[in-house]
């Protein structure tokens, strides 16, 4: 790539992440991340609530983890060979861009449902490479059918990738500023995970200024809805009629409810006991946890036989 004049180079996500960035660029990126963490820690401390004590500890652990990565890079003395920044990439098209949605967000709202907290190395790697291309005068294009899958907060991640300069112009320097501008945390009663009662839960799920948010996002987004795509297929000479997605009878899915078997009712009671034990720290996380409970419950809802370990 570095010594040839290709029109395009196509590679899979797995191959892309194997191309490293120059250590110096990585160090600058990580130091910027540390600055963001310091700001988030200061804001969490300024809040002063008992609830934010746990948030501060979480952010400080994240800061130490980033500082550890800085030390690792600083200790590397060997020649890296050809790195991504030396390949001369001036335009990057990323298909299935939702695969990189787990870009870690530094926030004082980490204990609130609806705020993304997942972090993946491949998302951080993609973000670093996107920023390098953009700062070098190049362009980045994302393509995905699911830019938002779990929460509206994922839109902030897409904006970080594609229009961070616009966020800076709007004085939105972090997720908390974005959340205050476009959303609100709501406290409400919800059915507990095991279904045995109710619990008070805070969720980031009320939004406002939506027209302004979408106008901002549409500066970088071309959005195609299902009906728009269906119309394009119907009017296309390249597509056959049978390529049109079939419609549900009555234009919507029909839910068929059935009574649980006695065995399933017994299993649900066991799920409640497991959940209580987990919440009371009566069981070690490696022995049982909510991820296992959720997975087992999904299997049981299909067929109890799927829980049998062969």
Stretches found by the model and what they are:
Residues 26, 105-110:
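Short, flexible, mixed-charge acidic loops at enzyme active sites
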Residues 2-43, 53-91, 99-101, 119-153, ...:
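Inter-lobe coupling linker of SF2 helicases/translocases
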Residues 113-118:
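Flexible beta-alpha connector loops of hexameric P-loop NTPases
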């Amino acid at each position: 790539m570095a010594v040839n004049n290709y029109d395009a180079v196509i590679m899979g996500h797995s191959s892309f992440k194997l191309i490293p960035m120059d250590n110096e660029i990585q160090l600058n990126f990580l130091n910027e991340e540390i600055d963001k963490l310091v700001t988030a820690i200061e804001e969490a401390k300024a809040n002063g609530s008992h609830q934010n004590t746990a948030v501060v500890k979480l952010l400080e652990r994240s800061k130490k983890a980033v500082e550890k990565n800085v030390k690792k890079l600083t200790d590397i003395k060997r020649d890296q060979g050809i790195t991504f920044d030396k390949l001369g990439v001036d335009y990057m098209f990323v298909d299935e861009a939702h695969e990189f949605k787990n870009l870690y967000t530094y926030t004082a709202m980490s204990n609130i449902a609806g705020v993304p907290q997942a972090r993946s190395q491949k998302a951080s790697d993609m973000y670093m490479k996107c920023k390098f291309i953009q700062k070098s005068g190049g362009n980045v294009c994302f393509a995905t059918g699911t830019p938002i899958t779990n929460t509206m907060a994922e839109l902030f991640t897409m904006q970080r990738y594609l229009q961070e300069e616009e966020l800076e112009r709007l004085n939105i320097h972090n997720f908390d500023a974005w959340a205050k501008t476009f959303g609100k945390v709501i406290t409400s009663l919800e059915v507990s995970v095991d279904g045995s009662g109710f619990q008070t839960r805070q969720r980031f799920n009320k939004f406002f200024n939506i027209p302004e948010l979408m106008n901002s996002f549409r500066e970088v987004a071309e959005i195609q809805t299902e009906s728009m795509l269906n119309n394009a297929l119907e009017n296309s000479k390249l597509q056959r009629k049978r390529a049109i997605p079939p419609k549900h009878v009555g234009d919507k899915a029909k839910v068929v409810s059935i009574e649980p078997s006695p065995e399933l009712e017994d299993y649900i009671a066991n799920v409640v006991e497991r959940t209580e034990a987990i919440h009371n720290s009566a069981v070690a996380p490696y022995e049982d946890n909510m991820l296992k409970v959720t997975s087992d419950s999904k299997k049981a809802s299909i067929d109890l036989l799927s829980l049998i370990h062969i």
